[in-house]
Amino acid sequence: MESKSEQNEWSSGVWAHLTAVRQQSPLVQCITNFVSMDLVANTLLSAGASPAMVHSVVEIPDFTPHIHALCVNVGTLTPDWLPSMKAAAELASQLRKPWVLDPAAVSCSGFRLKACLELIELKPTVIKGNGSEIIALSSASRGQTKGADSSHESTDAIEAAKSLAMSSGAVVAVSGAVDIVTDGKQVIGVHNGTKMMQQITATGCSLAGLIVAFLAIDSSRVLEATVSAMAVFGIAGELGEAMANGPASLRMHLIDCLYGLDETTVLKRVNVTRLG
């Protein structure tokens, strides 16, 4: 159980990160999937960041050096897109720009698993997935997944996430009923969010994009920036659900609530605990 002072510290940190994103409007390159581009871009815009959905391998050498951070999502991976992902990730790492890997449905094919393992070799700052994705990626074995949804709770994946963090050097974020963030030693739980968010496609992809924006303004505190992004997205979902009639209207309210988040609401609603 967190002490009140620790909880206040998390809450003030979350607000500070969101304020910095709004003030600095970091340029975030997203090489993401066809399904998620719209929601990812609008999530980033509503948080105050500047999204760029640039994915052509021809443009990487010219464009990527100018970004503040990179998001790579393999949701609709093809052999044509993989070189772009690798080129951008390699350049981001060389230039010490933070980047996030979202290994969507990583175990659905050998091609996808191999691609994600190759991307991990390029040193992502954060690896963000659901429980099944993190378990499959951690063991580098083919598991049974249900599309990009998760058949494992996030808490089931804690040990796999810690192992993956230690082997990859990345902070690992596991989305679920309780979001888990670990650097291999510390384990933080983010208890914000709502179940209905799982009924909207691309919310996980959008969360990865938001994490990238927060890393762009605080790359020296990767775990804390990741926790802040997950808390902010969860709070926006909670507020949105209170106004929504179902998933379609929640999608709209999620973006509006993220855009309108104020200090009082954030400080009151952040629910973060240390799990280990």
Swiss-Prot record:
Pathway noted in the entry: Cofactor biosynthesis; thiamine diphosphate biosynthesis; 4-methyl-5-(2-phosphoethyl)-thiazole from 5-(2-hydroxyethyl)-4-methylthiazole: step 1/1
The protein's enzyme class: transferase
Gene inactivation effect: No visible phenotype.
Obligatory cofactor(s): Mg(2+)
InterPro entries: Hyethyz_kinase, Ribokinase-like
Pfam families the UniProt entry points to: HK
SUPFAM superfamilies: Ribokinase-like
Binding-site residues, substrate: M53, A202
Catalytic reaction(s) noted: 5-(2-hydroxyethyl)-4-methylthiazole + ATP = 4-methyl-5-(2-phosphooxyethyl)-thiazole + ADP + H(+)
Induction text: Not regulated by thiamine or 4-methyl-5-(2-phosphonooxyethyl)thiazole.
Highest taxon listed in the record's lineage: Eukaryota
EC number: 2.7.1.50
MF-aspect GO terms: ATP binding; hydroxyethylthiazole kinase activity; magnesium ion binding
Gene Ontology terms describing biological process: thiamine biosynthetic process; thiamine diphosphate biosynthetic process; thiamine salvage
Record's keyword terms, sorted: ATP-binding, Kinase, Magnesium, Metal-binding, Nucleotide-binding, Thiamine biosynthesis, Transferase
Function text: Thiazole kinase involved in thiamine salvage pathway.
Family membership: Belongs to the Thz kinase family.
Protein name: Hydroxyethylthiazole kinase
Source organism (scientific name): Arabidopsis thaliana (Mouse-ear cress)
Upper taxonomic lineage: Eukaryota, Viridiplantae, Streptophyta, Embryophyta, Tracheophyta
Gene that produces this protein: THIM
